[in-house]
């Protein structure tokens, strides 16, 4: 049991520490005979052999990093690899932070819902739509109501008609479950 816990912790820390993949080749790990070299400042130094490029990078105190391995000849840049890796992880974290998660809120409605209860549910739907969340309005039918599903469908149609201006309405009337999905309209 102890070995397994340590084993899992090792992989957890390894996963946590390596945000970007280490597929970027540096220094001696770069394959090829000739490379197109870009200096630390961004100037093109031309095509050099692997040995010349490594000597130039080490004399300046930087690493030789392969940027475009599929180009002919491969493009390498002289730079500080640890700084490059840090910037890449920071860009990935910012991209994840700026992504918006799609949240779907669900409200259940019965076929025999009272008008005041329906108003309360619709107020909830408007609040969810203002927060730019999708809303799923599900029709719940009990017992013999399933035989008269058209009564519940009219309730869903009323809801769809009310929110047709403020939200995009997607109706799904399957055999057993009937629901609408309301997504907020994009403001241009």
UniProtKB/Swiss-Prot annotation:
The scientific name of the source species is Fusobacterium nucleatum subsp. nucleatum (strain ATCC 25586 / DSM 15643 / BCRC 10681 / CIP 101130 / JCM 8532 / KCTC 2640 / LMG 13131 / VPI 4355)
Any idea what this protein is called? Translation initiation factor IF-3
Q: Which Gene3D superfamilies does this one have?
A: Translation initiation factor 3 (IF-3), C-terminal domain, Translation initiation factor 3 (IF-3), N-terminal domain
Give the location in the cell: Cytoplasm
- What GO cellular component is one of the record's annotations? cytosol
Q: What does this protein do?
A: IF-3 binds to the 30S ribosomal subunit and shifts the equilibrium between 70S ribosomes and their 50S and 30S subunits in favor of the free subunits, thus enhancing the availability of 30S subunits on which protein synthesis initiation begins.
What PROSITE patterns is this protein classified in? Answer: IF3 (PS00938)
Q: Member of which family?
A: Belongs to the IF-3 family.
Output the PANTHER family linked to this UniProt entry. Answer: TRANSLATION INITIATION FACTOR IF-3, TRANSLATION INITIATION FACTOR IF-3, MITOCHONDRIAL
Q: Keywords for this entry?
A: Cytoplasm, Initiation factor, Protein biosynthesis
Which GO terms are recorded in the biological process aspect for this UniProt protein? ribosome disassembly
MF annotations from Gene Ontology: ribosome binding; translation initiation factor activity
């Amino acid at each position: 049991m102890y070995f397994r816990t340590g084993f899992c912790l090792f992989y957890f820390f390894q996963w946590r520490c390596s945000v970007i993949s280490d597929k970027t080749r540096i220094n001696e790990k770069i394959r090829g005979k000739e490379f197109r070299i870009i200096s630390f400042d961004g100037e093109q130094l031309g095509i050099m052999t692997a040995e010349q490029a490594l000597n130039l990078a080490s004399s300046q105190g930087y690493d030789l990093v392969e940027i475009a391995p599929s180009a002919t000849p491969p493009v390498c840049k002289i730079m500080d690899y640890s700084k490059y890796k840090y910037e890449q992880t920071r860009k990935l974290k910012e991209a994840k932070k700026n992504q918006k998660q799609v949240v779907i809120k669900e409200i259940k409605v019965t076929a025999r819902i009272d008008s005041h209860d329906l108003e309360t549910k619709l107020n909830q739907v408007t609040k969810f739509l203002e927060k730019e969340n999708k809303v799923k309005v599900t029709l719940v039918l009990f017992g013999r109501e399933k035989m008269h599903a058209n009564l519940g469908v009219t309730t869903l149609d009323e809801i769809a008609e009310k929110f047709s201006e403020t939200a995009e309405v997607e109706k799904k009337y399957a055999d057993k479950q009937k629901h609408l999905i309301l997504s907020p309209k994009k403001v241009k």
